[in-house]
Amino acid sequence: DAVSLLMMTAMYALDRRKYRRGGDTVPHLTRRMLAVALPLAVSAYARTSLTTLEHLLIPRGLKSAGLTADRALEGYGIVHGMALPVVLFPSCLLYALADLLVPELTTAQVSGRCGDIRRLVRTLLYRCLLFACGTAVLLLAFSGPLGRLIYHSDDAGRFIRLLAPLVPVMYLDTVTDGCLRGLGQQTRCMAINVLDATLGVVLVWALLPRFGLAGYLFVLYFNECVNFTLSFTLLLRTVRRCCADEKPPA
């Protein structure tokens, strides 16, 4: 993170020096940037803190469910350190796609091109769904061999299989968040993520002492579905509003 910050600062300094050489200045640019950046930063810090609290509560909840300390940490490690990395690994392509999507949608929104916005969003969600469903099928079919090949663990394969049906929801949520950022909904998108993290803390605290790992799997499914439903609903409303404000042809 420190190296990334230094690189971004250096690139910003170079760009700023280049644009100082000529051209019109943008009034109140710093104030406008901070108006977007500060709420996002505060929301990101809040979500990170809540996620950390959730991860601290998981082993304690598993221990309260009757597991020994070693078994509780083992169960937590299998889910978070083994199964989830395998399930989420293919989504690195979608994260790159979501980042590339932001300027495309922003340009279309500023230009008032409703047709382009609809086409981009529809195409990306459709292709993401195909990719996610294919990934889920492969994970379901090869969960056992993957667990044994990568971790030499049948338990890891079992949890990969249990998490595989959640892949379409997780991957679609990634692309949906990218679309929302491109359409200027960063703050609302982050608010949904903070709500998701808060809900995760409450459910982990309430369910894990009673249901153990089964309760944690329920929390993962429930939170991902709630997050995607809220994000997708916001995306539909944002696209409709953009199209309602479409600039008439000259």
Where are these regions (language model features)?
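Residue-level signature of transmembrane alpha-helical cores of multipass secondary-active transporters
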Residues: 1, 32-48, 81-84, 88, ...
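Helix-loop junctions and terminal segments of transmembrane helices
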Residues: 87-111
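Interhelical loop/hinge segments that connect adjacent transmembrane helices in multipass membrane
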Residues: 9-44, 238-250
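Selective transmembrane-helix segments that form parts of the transport pathway or gating/packing helices
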Residues: 124-136
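Hydrophobic, small-residue-rich membrane helices and short re-entrant helix-turn-helix hairpins
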Residues: 20-33, 69-73, 102-122
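Short membrane-interface helical motifs at transmembrane helix boundaries
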Residues: 134-152
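Short runs within selected transmembrane alpha-helices of multi-pass transporters and secretion channels
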Residues: 1-9, 158-182, 188-204, 208, ...
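Helix-terminus/linker motif at the lipid-water interface of multi-pass membrane proteins
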Residues: 45-89, 147-149
